[in-house]
Amino acid sequence: MNTQKLFREITEEQFKSDVPAFRPGDTVRVHVKVVEGTRERIQIFEGVVIKRKGGGISETFTVRKISYGVGVERAFPLHSPRVAQIEVVRYGKVRRAKLYYLRNLRGKAARIKEIRR
């Protein structure tokens, strides 16, 4: 068996089929499995998707939220087994693929217009 075929088989079994369609500007709620000692629990991280990067099994997305007045960004591998679930809370209308400019905006200026789907 050649390496390309082996690589394709391994990646196909790692792919998640239940990933919802979301784009930068959308507000998502990511359920992440967190291991603390011997326990495993689900932690929810909700924020705006500021970018999607890569493709295939190595695709990642970055979510930004404001927590106690401080901006927090977290990058997640899309097909990671640590990501239990992704919910789309709100669909936003933006005209860019990378929303890095949100890092410099504060308060109401950082809002994104919502669209109905």
Curated annotation (Swiss-Prot):
A GO molecular-function term, please?
A: structural constituent of ribosome
A Gene Ontology CC term for this entry?
cytosolic large ribosomal subunit
GO BP annotations of the record are: translation
Q: Which InterPro entries match?
A: Ribosomal_bL19, Ribosomal_bL19_CS, Ribosomal_bL19_sf, Translation_prot_SH3-like_sf
Family matches, as Pfam families: Ribosomal_L19
Domain of life from the UniProt record: Bacteria
Q: What are the UniProt keywords, alphabetically?
A: Ribonucleoprotein, Ribosomal protein
Provide the function of this protein.
This protein is located at the 30S-50S ribosomal subunit interface and may play a role in the structure and function of the aminoacyl-tRNA binding site.
Instruction: Family membership, please give it.
Output: Belongs to the bacterial ribosomal protein bL19 family.
Name of the protein: Large ribosomal subunit protein bL19
Q: Which organism is it from?
A: Exiguobacterium sp. (strain ATCC BAA-1283 / AT1b)
